[in-house]
Amino acid sequence: FSGDKKTALENLPANLISKLKVYDKKSKEEEFTGISSGEKKYVLDLQTKDELNKTWLTNATVGYGNNKKKDLEAQVNYFRKNGENLSFIARSTNRYQNSTYKDNINNSLGLNMAHKFGGKFSLNGHVNYNLNRNGNISSMYQEQYLTGGNQYSASANEGNSKGRSVNSSLLGEWKVDKSTRVNFSGNFGYTPNQNESNSQSASFDAPPGVNHENLFSDFESVPRDIKVNRSENRSRSENESHRYHWAMGVMRRLNEKGTTLGLNIQNSDSWGNNESFSLSETTYFRLKDKNGNDSVLYRNQYLKSPQRNNSWRVGLSFTQPVGKKVRLRVAYNWSTR
């Protein structure tokens, strides 16, 4: 699954797996030159049962419950013993969302492939899409009995969020001949998110006598002489992020001793924009303005913060064996941000 361990572990049925291993895997450059970089890169190795190789496997799950709960999933998998595979996973569920907000849902699609073209060229890649909508409505009424006077307060809140993401990666290796290797990789991601919230609160010095779930829609029916203050707040935010990364490496073994010359090029870019605003209105019923009306405090805020990051890296290395167990490596790296 092109490094997506979560997708593999959560979606592949356990009865398809014969072996599961986690180990530190050498990079293509380390395998070719025999020199370790010292960095740990753990990989998850899943092996399917032999009787399932060269077989198309499909699976569908449908679940419905009370409070409009649902869990729908479909899978198509194809595996071969040499590591080639093709998998498609689709899921739509609100099973794990605790709120009964009408639009709560999590939808996901995933496609993964690994293929070898003869003995010289191989490709691994995946594309994932995810949509998550989550909202909640709540209300509260509170009474406090104090020696200096009782206090009564109520609040109502509604919030919802919508997040989407698209992620993809591609890995390739080309064994040009016994002495030359070309490796390349790339990935990109796009993530837009939206959040909205509305809240109201009020305080009184006597019980308002209105059901707290309908208090703000019937606020005018509350006696004026017991009102202390009322606050209304609205906010909305949107953020959008893009990213991509690509890398390419060429390694050439110059002689039978293992003298190796390597060239690596990498480029990463990410950009995005965060935008938010909030509106607030607070009325003080016990504090009058110069005209004798209730005092009102208004607060309006707007924020916008664009972001951009770009980097390049070019590396050149030379590896020379010195004896059977010793290798000398000289490298030069140039980078910019």
Predicted regions and their residues:
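Primarily recognizes Gram-negative and organellar outer-membrane beta-barrels
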Residues: K5-K6, D24-L72, N82-R337
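Short acidic/polar hinge/loop motifs at secondary-structure boundaries
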Residues: S2-K26
